[in-house]
From Swiss-Prot:
It comes from Vibrio vulnificus (strain YJ016). GO terms for molecular function: purine-nucleoside phosphorylase activity. This is Purine nucleoside phosphorylase DeoD-type 2. The gene is deoD2. It is an enzyme of class 2 (transferase). The lineage of its organism: Bacteria, Pseudomonadati, Pseudomonadota, Gammaproteobacteria, Vibrionales. A purine D-ribonucleoside binds at residues 5, 180-182, 204-205. Keywords: Glycosyltransferase, Transferase.
Amino acid sequence: MATPHINAQPGDFAETVLMPGDPLRAKYIAETFLEDVKQVCDVRNMFGFTGTYKGKKVSVMGHGMGIPSACIYVHELIAEYGVKNVIRVGSCGAVRDDVNLMDVVIGMGASTDSKVNRIRFNDHDFAALADYGLLEEAVKQARAQNVPVKVGNVFSADLFYTPEADIFEKMEKLGILGVDMEAAGIYGVAADLKAKALTILTVSDHIIRGEKLSSEDRQKSFNDMMKVALETAINL
């Protein structure tokens, strides 16, 4: 049965869904990496696809930009379509000095300036964590493919253009690896609905050093990350 934001039918989604922010990136993943692909939803042009990877059923769907958008799609996938594993695949801006362009960052935990998880938890702090089984498998797959990987805390920002000029230095001091805009919200939804979630990010720029990937290196880095995510998805 369709939801307000997803017009797929029951059974259209695999138990594991890979979720980039950009719906066109979801289309790229489906067309590049999956076989026997079927488009299962297109409401608001937020495309979703299901196919197979090495013979195993996998789905991919965009979640939009920011915690509110991501939470809507993740909630509906889990609550209405029976999805059990959500793996966000995206990019981040690095802040810690030992994190480099093209590294893969896996968000073991996610800090945030959003109140979304405080709203869930009677205004208390909530430790937004990845599922350990997903995390362990992703690290294993990254190392098997010789992809440089860092595991630790990320920061999910509500504002892309932040007015807090000193926040990145404080993040670095606290050991935060990089900044995205969704992980903390996704982890909160998964915890609330008793599902599993993980965030895998490729480092597209270094905020403090002012470094950025070229378009060619950005694509290669994304493809490397996707192979890690897909191998994780089929080995759960």
